[in-house]
């Protein structure tokens, strides 16, 4: 009886030691959050591993996301996919549809170009109109757009940038929240794990690829909602808008294109003999064919222009956004307690398994110690 009690006692003692040791080891990953000192000497293992390596972890995560998850090539591929093209074209169609409901008149457009519509009635319409437009283009083609357009119009365009930022963030959230976005993140993560081999395989001791992909998805979605992200996107759009304003007119529209559009407007004006009356009526009533032209032809060209322009300047855009630094700064702002809860939430089952394994191994070792103690 004494022998059995000895073995049982050693098993219980070994299990307690093994389990508690693993529990302490897990706790030491996170705690303490700050270093402790005795006199001038720092107590070993303070702070915990994750608080101590926090900046390095943030830097590595930012590097992984920038180099392997959200890359320039991936964004270019997404931009050139039919779904993205259709989405952009639908947005342009939506804006053209709004034009149908606006009370923009030819008189306002002509006045914007410096043309007195009433004076056109007294001159040969064709010669006067085309000559005036061509003269205006020749006079302004080497001027910057910001020097040509009224300041009120430029301010109105600039005011739309925040709406574009909200739209981009919303589309990003919709994509990341979709099944396709979830699948793409998992596939990228799976490719990354396969490329990195054993080192990354150690991470799977604490969490599965599914849980990591799920967490990345949630954090990326949260990132699109973060004010700092929206602020950076708005800044990039503002910078690109300022660059666009500084382009010369002939960089935006070529001479032949300008002549084609001028001729189109002229043909529509010649359709109406009562020019003064017609120019004061909304475009949607006067020249519905022009709206149709915008819908059928211009929207496609604008879509191609947006996609090609974005792809061309994507490197500069990514540099200005600095995704790696953005992620690193965001992670460094997280409260350590939040990071602890986040990791425990992801790897809860695995951590419990490690603690259970400590109890089991400790019990087994205690059993053999008890057996050895009997014969010693």
From Swiss-Prot:
Cystine pairs:
none
Could you name the Gene Ontology cellular component terms for this entry? Answer: plasma membrane
Task: Tell me how this protein sits in the membrane.
Answer: Multi-pass membrane protein
- Keywords, sorted A to Z: Cell membrane, Membrane, Transmembrane, Transmembrane helix
UniProt cross-references to InterPro entries, sorted A to Z: DUF445, UCP032178
Quote the Pfam families the UniProt record gives. Answer: DUF445 (PF04286)
User: TM segments?
Assistant: 4-24, 356-376
Origin, by domain of life?
A: Bacteria
Q: Where in the cell is it found?
A: Cell membrane
Report whether Transmembrane helix shows up as a keyword of the record.
yes
Q: Does the keyword Membrane apply?
A: yes
Q: In terms of one coarse class, where is the protein primarily found?
A: membrane
In terms of PANTHER family, this protein maps to: UPF0754 MEMBRANE PROTEIN YHEB
Family under the similarity heading: Belongs to the UPF0754 family.
Name the UniProt record assigns to this protein: UPF0754 membrane protein SERP1382
């Amino acid at each position: 009886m004494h022998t059995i009690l000895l073995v049982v006692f050693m098993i219980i003692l070994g299990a307690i030691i093994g389990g508690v040791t693993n529990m302490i080891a897990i706790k030491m990953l996170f705690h303490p959050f700050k270093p402790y000192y005795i006199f001038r000497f720092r107590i070993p293992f303070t702070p915990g591993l994750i608080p101590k390596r926090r900046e390095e972890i943030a830097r590595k995560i930012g590097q992984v996301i920038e180099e392997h998850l959200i890359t320039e090539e991936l964004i270019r591929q997404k931009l050139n996919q039919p779904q993205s093209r259709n989405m952009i074209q639908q947005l342009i169609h939506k804006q053209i549809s709004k034009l149908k409901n606006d009370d923009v008149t030819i008189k306002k457009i002509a006045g914007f170009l410096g043309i007195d519509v009433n004076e056109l009635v007294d001159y040969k319409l064709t010669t006067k109109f085309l000559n005036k437009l061509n003269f205006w283009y020749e006079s302004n083609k080497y001027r910057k757009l910001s020097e040509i357009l009224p300041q009120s119009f430029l301010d109105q365009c600039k005011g739309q940038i925040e709406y574009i930022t909200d739209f981009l963030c919303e589309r990003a959230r919709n994509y990341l929240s979709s099944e396709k976005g979830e699948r793409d993140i998992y596939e990228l993560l799976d490719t990354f794990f396969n490329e990195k081999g054993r080192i990354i395989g150690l991470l799977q001791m604490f969490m599965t690829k599914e849980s990591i992909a799920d967490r990345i998805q949630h954090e990326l979605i949260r990132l699109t909602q973060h004010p700092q992200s929206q602020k950076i996107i708005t800044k990039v759009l503002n910078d690109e808008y300022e660059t666009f304003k500084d382009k010369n007119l002939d960089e935006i529209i070529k001479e032949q294109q300008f002549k084609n559009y001028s001729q189109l407007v002229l043909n529509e004006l010649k359709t109406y003999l009562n020019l003064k009356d017609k120019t004061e009526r909304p475009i949607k009533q006067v020249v519905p064919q022009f709206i149709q032209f915008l819908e059928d032809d211009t929207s496609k060209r604008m879509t191609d222009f947006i996609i090609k322009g974005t792809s061309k300047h994507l490197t500069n855009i990514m540099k200005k956004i600095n995704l790696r630094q953005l992620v690193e700064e965001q992670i460094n702002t997280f409260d350590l307690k939040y990071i602890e809860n986040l990791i425990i939430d992801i790897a809860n089952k695995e951590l419990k398994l490690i603690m259970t394994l400590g109890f089991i191994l400790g019990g087994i070792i205690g059993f053999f110690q008890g057996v050895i103690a009997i014969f010693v």
